[in-house]
């Protein structure tokens, strides 16, 4: 249970970005899915850039929820690490901007991840977040659609470039993102397990 219920009745819109950041840092590690859904308007007041996600119909067979509800599920599914939860909260921030419809009325979000990375960094920078956190969230948001393959040489290169902790967090974000869309296929589950095993091996 987070401190979200205690904020009811307060004028959150009058808070400075730094004050909103401090509140969210106190909330995110322990917030539940139920709270994220019940207090969705409150969350979107604390992060106004999330407002377009409220009720946003993704028009896709790959998504069973509106955009905000999907984001809420992802936040609740990743571990309670603060930086990882910030990345989960902002991972699809680029979707409303990237959204297009094809001739059959299906929604597409081409390039939303690399578009969203800098957007997430801008949000956190305006809130006064530490630069290390800004950089990590930017990496995770930008890369959350990149396929992690169980190829030890490639994973080793990725780890050497970004660090084992960052790549481990990326895997956690991708797993949560996939789970929130429905039951992952057998191939996806096996791939995630294989990647996790290689990352565990690289720790030694």
Language model features with spans:
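Divalent metal-dependent catalytic cores for phosphoryl transfer on phosphate-bearing substrates
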Residues: 75-183
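Glycine- and charge-enriched loop/helix tracts that form the active or gating conduit
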Residues: 1-81, 85, 93-107, 118-128
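Short, mixed-charge aromatic SLiMs
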Residues: 9-17, 111-112, 143-148, 195-204
